[in-house]
């Protein structure tokens, strides 16, 4: 053994060939944490010091190759001063360069996923052989960063600037054939032939058949583009990528600028330019929020896995209530492999549900995401029925009938009498108390809430609601079924609106106050879209449905009268009374036309101004900053209350619920991370400036205590520091 560590070993194979193997002990994947980087340095030094070594093959002992850097280390690392961060980055890069500069040929055998730093390590080798099943990519832009281990330097010099810009700016994973096509790898072979192919390649390089030094040289030189080619490659790309990414995600454009800046320099100077830019990105609020979001997502998945131990397997599901929602739930279950009965009392509703499932499956077929055979299999897994005849062997029933407590209670009591004693019943409700609905049941321990978001096939979140009498097994089984459906489940405790709607309605409350203060709703939409929301509140209300919003607001006002009840008529009341229900009937805040693709397209409708005139009680001068604060303070404070009330267990779950459920701007990290980014004390002071607007703007006593003690929700420095 030439070298042996906890993450890397180097052993002799044959005829001077050595194998440098990544296999991080105690982990399911390889990643570049401090330990692995340190051992990589020692392993490279050991190879350098051994005169008998004629070539190096790099392999992985895991199913994947190397998944990238250890993101859990970023939080503390990125708090360091810029100069220290740059120095640390260059120190790490020296290890990759030392590996690249070995006086023998190097071949990497990519057996599985190689992402981020994992791919950057591969780029430092002379040759890359890839299993046909493997995937490679540089996804750093998804964290608000760009490659920092030489990716912006080596990749353009290997596959050309245009291809490298596309790979780096998109952050996408690339299949083996695509990687071969652009020259990112030198060969693609069947997985079982990977080791033999790597050995063959290294032997041919050792024998001189392949000139590894000539292969290496372009990576050490300037980028081979003249001034006109550079201008065409970089300026065009910057404009296009800026349009795609938008102003809140600076990393893709900064990556292109870095490649451009470094184009006229050799490797070492180019790496210095990359390091400076990488650190600049690491210090942005967007990067800190997106890294936090990634870590929150990991925590969420870990929590969901924790339920697996007591979850029962759902082999057969059922949905009560067909139509669009029932069809969407049936589609999602069937396409992910769980057969489902779809029951309704009306044949036309069944047909509507089947049409919805068929339309969604057809869409996947058209896009090449599904074969015709798989589509047929999924359609056959949805069995429509008008009776309870086959419900005896159903493991879980999702009730998705109209949002009316009496109707739901009647339907749930009826289905309970037609299923097995251990069958779990789950109500797809957005606002009705699960404990209230459970009063109609003989086995309330088998009952939970399972709140899907519309449209079901697109929205990643499912709220699993624990009622007063819900058993842990019922909760766990519903979480497991939601995961099986490809959703991100969050367990919340019962209260009006649960987590997402309880937080959303104070946001709409801020909007209603603005409109009543004479602020143009079109302007409000533009300001909130600029802030980062996918759509403004008026447009969102039209999409949700004015009638749905009106009903939800009344439920929330009844549940939290101290702060959500408003005796004055609002914009929602005015539109509801005028039967302007939003997209569903072609007019709400906006009017709707059908575009060329048959989708609704919003247009301004002057007639709405007359409808809104009676609910405008004053004309206030309000700045864009005020608009953001009127909207965001109530949302953030209600999220704080949900955490304090134990509706949601952790800050991570609260934030991810808002990102997955209502499109909270990801680059801001969620409501609680947004408070952290401002500073808890600063946020409390900001809220106090708007105290005259009512109870929704009042910080809780506990939040004031956090402010006084200098605490934060995620226990890290503000991203503004």
UniProtKB/Swiss-Prot annotation:
Protein family according to the UniProt entry: In the N-terminal section; belongs to the enoyl-CoA hydratase/isomerase family. In the C-terminal section; belongs to the 3-hydroxyacyl-CoA dehydrogenase family.
Region (Enoyl-CoA hydratase/isomerase), start-end ranges: 1-190
Protein's name in the database: Fatty acid oxidation complex subunit alpha
SUPFAM superfamilies: 6-phosphogluconate dehydrogenase C-terminal domain-like (SSF48179), ClpP/crotonase (SSF52096), NAD(P)-binding Rossmann-fold domains (SSF51735)
Active site feature: 451 (for 3-hydroxyacyl-coa dehydrogenase activity)
Single GO cellular component term: fatty acid beta-oxidation multienzyme complex
Alphabetized UniProt keyword annotations: Fatty acid metabolism, Isomerase, Lipid degradation, Lipid metabolism, Lyase, Multifunctional enzyme, NAD, Oxidoreductase
């Amino acid at each position: 053994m030439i070298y042996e560590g906890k993450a890397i070993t180097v052993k002799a194979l044959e005829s001077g060939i050595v194998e440098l193997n990544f296999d991080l002990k105690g982990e399911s994947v390889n990643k570049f944490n401090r330990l692995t980087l340190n051992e990589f340095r020692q392993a490279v030094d050991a190879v350098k010091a051994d005169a008998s070594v004629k070539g190096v093959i790099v392999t992985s002992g895991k199913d994947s190759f190397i998944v990238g850097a250890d993101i859990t280390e970023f939080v503390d690392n990125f708090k360091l001063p810029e100069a220290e961060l740059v120095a640390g980055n260059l120190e790490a890069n020296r290890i990759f360069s030392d590996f690249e500069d070995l006086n023998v040929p190097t071949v990497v055998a990519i057996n599985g996923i190689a992402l981020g730093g994992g791919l950057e390590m591969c780029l430092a080798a002379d040759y890359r052989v890839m299993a046909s099943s493997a995937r490679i990519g540089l996804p750093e832009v998804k964290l608000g960063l760009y490659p920092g281990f030489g990716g912006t330097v080596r990749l353009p010099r290997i596959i050309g600037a245009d291809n490298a810009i596309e790979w780096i700016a998109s952050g996408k994973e690339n299949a083996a054939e695509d990687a071969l096509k652009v020259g990112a790898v030198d060969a693609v072979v069947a997985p079982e032939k990977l080791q033999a192919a790597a050995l063959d390649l290294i032997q041919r390089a050792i024998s001189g058949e392949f000139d590894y030094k000539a292969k290496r040289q372009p990576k050490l030189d300037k980028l081979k583009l003249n001034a006109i080619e550079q201008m065409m490659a970089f300026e065009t790309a910057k404009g296009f990528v800026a349009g795609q990414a938008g102003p809140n995600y600076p990393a893709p454009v900064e990556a292109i600028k870095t490649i451009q800046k470094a184009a006229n320099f050799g490797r070492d100077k180019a790496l210095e330019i990359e390091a400076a830019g990488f650190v600049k990105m690491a210090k942005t609020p967007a990067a800190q929020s997106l890294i936090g979001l990634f870590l929150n997502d990991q925590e969420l998945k870990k929590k969901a896995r924790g339920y697996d131990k007591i979850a029962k397997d759902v082999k057969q599901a059922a949905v009560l209530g067909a139509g669009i929602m029932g069809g969407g739930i049936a589609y999602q279950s069937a396409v992910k492999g769980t057969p489902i009965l779809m029951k309704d009392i009306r044949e036309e509703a069944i047909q509507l549900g089947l049409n919805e499932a068929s339309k969604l499956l057809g869409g996947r077929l058209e896009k090449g995401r599904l074969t015709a055979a798989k589509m047929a299999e999924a359609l056959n897994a949805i069995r429509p029925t008008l009776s309870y005849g086959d419900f005896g062997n159903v493991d879980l029933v999702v009730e998705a009938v109209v949002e009316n407590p009496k109707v739901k209670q009647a339907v749930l009591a009826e289905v309970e009498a037609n299923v097995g004693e251990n069958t779990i019943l789950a109500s797809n409700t957005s606002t009705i108390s699960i404990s209230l609905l459970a009063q109609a049941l003989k086995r309330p321990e088998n009952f939970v809430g399972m709140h899907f978001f519309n449209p079901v096939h697109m929205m990643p979140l499912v709220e699993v609601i624990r009622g007063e009498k819900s058993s842990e097994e019922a909760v766990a089984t519903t979480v497991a079924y939601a995961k099986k459906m490809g959703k991100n489940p969050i367990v919340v405790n019962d209260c009006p609106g649960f987590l997402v709607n309880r937080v959303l309605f104070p946001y709409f409350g801020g909007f209603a106050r603005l409109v009543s203060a004479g602020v143009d709703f079109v302007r409000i939409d533009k300001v909130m879209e600029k802030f980062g929301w996918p759509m403004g509140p008026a447009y969102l209300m039209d999409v949700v449905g004015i009638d749905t919003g009106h009903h939800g607001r009344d439920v929330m006002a009844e549940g939290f009268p101290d702060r959500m009840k408003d005796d004055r008529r609002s914009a929602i009341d005015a539109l509801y009374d005028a039967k302007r229900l939003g997209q569903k009937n072609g007019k709400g805040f906006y009017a709707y036309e059908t575009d060329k693709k048959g989708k609704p397209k919003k247009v301004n409708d002057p007639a709405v101004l007359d409808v809104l005139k009676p609910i405008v009680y004053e004309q206030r001068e309000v700045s864009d900053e005020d608009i953001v604060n009127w909207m965001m303070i109530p949302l953030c404070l209600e999220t704080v209350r949900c955490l304090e009330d134990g509706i949601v267990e952790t800050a991570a779950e609260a934030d991810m619920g808002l990102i997955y459920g209502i499109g909270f701007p990801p680059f801001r990290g969620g409501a609680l991370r947004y408070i952290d980014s401002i500073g808890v004390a600063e946020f409390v002071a900001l809220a106090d400036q708007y105290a005259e607007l009512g109870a929704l703007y009042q910080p809780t006593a506990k939040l004031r205590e956090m402010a006084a003690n200098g605490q934060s929700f995620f226990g890290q420095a503000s991203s503004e520091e």
